Regions:
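Basic, often amphipathic N-terminal segments
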Residues: 1-61, 66-69, 84-139, 152-161
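Short, low-order "capping/linker" segments at domain edges
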Residues: 71-83
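Short, exposed beta-strand-loop hairpins at the edges of beta-sheets
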Residues: 140-146
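Residue-level signal for glycine
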Residues: 148-150
Length: 161
């Protein structure tokens, strides 16, 4: 079983890149889940199709908040622009794909109707309130069991509309 995360980085990111500490600034599209390794190739293909269907993704910074089990992780909530609830709809579609491939969601209480699109602050940076950006990529990231390093397993380019 692989421990995976789906994000959209605000900073350039490449397949194969390894992060020993934290990830760069990113939107968490799906928090950690486990997936049987034998499902991975088909899973990656289906995620790619979903990402293409929801592309492009445009966001704007909203209010600050704190997430995590102790409410001590500073985040910037975000709003999807353009087609409305695009990030929430993409999140729901990816959840269906995760479930179809026997995925196990680490914190189901933060999923589906409880999903709050956000950017976790990295070195004091996220988006400013009302700041707009287009997301350029969606990434599949694996947390390695022994070291807890995170490796970028796949990167999907988003349409630039």
């Amino acid at each position: 079983m692989s421990e995976l995360l789906i994000t959209s980085s605000l900073d350039p990111i490449e397949k194969g890149q390894v992060f020993s500490k934290g990830l760069p600034r990113h939107v968490t599209i799906w928090q950690y889940f486990q997936l049987p390794d034998f499902h991975r190739d088909v899973f990656i293909a289906e995620v790619g199709e979903a990402v293409e269907a929801f592309s492009p993704l445009e966001i704007m910074g909203a209010e600050c908040d704190h997430f995590g089990p102790n409410n001590d992780v500073p985040v910037r909530r975000i709003m999807a622009l353009g087609s409305g609830a695009t990030l929430i709809a993409l999140h729901a579609t990816l959840g269906e794909i995760i479930n179809r491939h026997d995925g196990v969601i680490a914190n189901p209480e933060w999923a589906y109707q409880n999903y709050n699109p956000h950017i976790t602050y990295v070195e004091g940076q996220a988006l400013e309130e009302a700041e707009y950006t287009k997301l350029r990529t969606v990434e599949l990231i694996e947390r390695l069991p022994a070291s807890k390093d995170k490796i970028v397993r796949n990167v999907w380019e988003l349409e630039d509309a």
